[in-house]
UniProtKB/Swiss-Prot annotation:
The keyword Kinase does not apply. GO terms for cellular component: nucleus. Its main location: nucleus. One of its GO terms (biological process) is response to molecule of bacterial origin. The lineage of its organism: Eukaryota, Viridiplantae, Streptophyta, Embryophyta, Tracheophyta. The keyword Metal-binding does not apply. Pfam families: WRKY. Transcription factor. Interacts specifically with the W box (5'-(T)TGAC[CT]-3'), a frequently occurring elicitor-responsive cis-acting element. GO terms for molecular function: DNA-binding transcription factor activity; transcription cis-regulatory region binding. This is Probable WRKY transcription factor 40. It comes from the Eukaryota. InterPro entries: WRKY_dom, WRKY_dom_sf, WRKY_plant. PANTHER family: WRKY TRANSCRIPTION FACTOR 36-RELATED, WRKY TRANSCRIPTION FACTOR 40-RELATED. Keywords: DNA-binding, Nucleus, Transcription, Transcription regulation.
Amino acid sequence: MDQYSSSLVDTSLDLTIGVTRMRVEEDPPTSALVEELNRVSAENKKLSEMLTLMCDNYNVLRKQLMEYVNKSNITERDQISPPKKRKSPAREDAFSCAVIGGVSESSSTDQDEYLCKKQREETVVKEKVSRVYYKTEASDTTLVVKDGYQWRKYGQKVTRDNPSPRAYFKCACAPSCSVKKKVQRSVEDQSVLVATYEGEHNHPMPSQIDSNNGLNRHISHGGSASTPVAANRRSSLTVPVTTVDMIESKKVTSPTSRIDFPQVQKLLVEQMASSLTKDPNFTAALAAAVTGKLYQQNHTEK
């Protein structure tokens, strides 16, 4: 049987075409890679924390260095310049002075002084604004108000709320007298001039000065008025001064309460004349002056 089987021919068909079998190599295990990745991530995180801590320490050191430098500068400045003398709290806001080597130096800035001065000027102007109404003729188209003072016109313009133009005047004694005046016709009544004054005059009226000078010339020309009489005359001239409040009251809103300046001037003249006639010294001086004048005229005619 064994011999028979060995003598048989192997008739099996080999279907392979000569291609060798390929062995598929398996990948290494991924656990090692995952472990390496975790290690690198942990190292990066640790480095980031160290860098953050280093930045914080740098900022703290830098802040301490700046504080030390500032303190050093302040100490050096205090050693070079002596301490300033502290003034009272009331005047501390206005200015503070430090005396260095006998020379006074003001530590307040020019801007602060300018603002304080401007605020004071505005306060004074607001407190001294007055308005006066003057009655004029219907045919009078000028904006001239005769209030006893001399003015200089420096401008004129038309406003939106009034068809009549507004004229601007300043005192003829400027810049020593800073009073200003605005004149414009009333919207309700075109025959009424509204004069707005800003400030107060620091000098008497020119008309009063002229009248006083005329009386002085009259009495001195007579030659018989003594010094006490002249002193009494001057005192009598200064007594009957009547102050007229020309400031418009806030309660008056209509142009019915107006002040006629010629009537006020007439009242002042009457009061002055009555007070002068009641003074016996002035009467005697006036009589002596008139007598001396008549005597000189008669002597000249002869």
